[in-house]
Amino acid sequence: MQEVTIYSDGACKGNPGRGGWGAVLVAGASEKEMFGGEPNTTNNRMEMTAVIEALRALKRPCVVRVYTDSQYVQKGISEWLPGWKARGWKTADKKPVKNADLWQELDTLAQPHQISWHWVRGHNGHPGNERADALANRGVESIGR
């Protein structure tokens, strides 16, 4: 299976507010940059959308390393998701899972791949994360004011 590294980030001007997402996909010597935005969203939704759009771009099952500065994404997919699914998309205290639509989409898109999820400290000079951050900000700017 092909190995792919994904660096993802989300940004929001206001929370909720104008948001953007960015992702860098690296497979060997090939790289792809992606970004987009939404007019009324949250930082967590943009963090998730970055990974969703990156996984959507993969055309076949891959071994994937995802690097995100969002503990919400990293812990959500690695730790919390199985419990949410078992409880019918409810949290441990029986409340509806926030962003369940995106969690369900992310769960579906992750299935064909062997994914390892890695948290990196944001704005700490990590080159892949810095590129994803710049793309996410381009996504915000693409929405206008």
Curated annotation (Swiss-Prot):
EC number(s) on file: 3.1.26.4
Pfam families: RNase_H
Cofactor: Mg(2+)
Residue positions binding Mg(2+) 1: 9, 47, 69
Record-annotated membrane-spanning stretches: none
Any GO MF annotation of the entry: nucleic acid binding
Locations listed in the record: Cytoplasm
Known catalytic reactions: Endonucleolytic cleavage to 5'-phosphomonoester
UniProt domain RNase H type-1: residue ranges: 1-141
Signal peptide: none
GO cellular component terms given for this protein: cytoplasm
Entry's cofactor comment: Binds 1 Mg(2+) ion per subunit. May bind a second metal ion at a regulatory site, or after substrate binding.
Domain of life: Bacteria
GO biological processes: DNA replication, removal of RNA primer
Record-linked HAMAP family: RNase_H
Protein family (similarity comment): Belongs to the RNase H family.
Protein name: Ribonuclease H
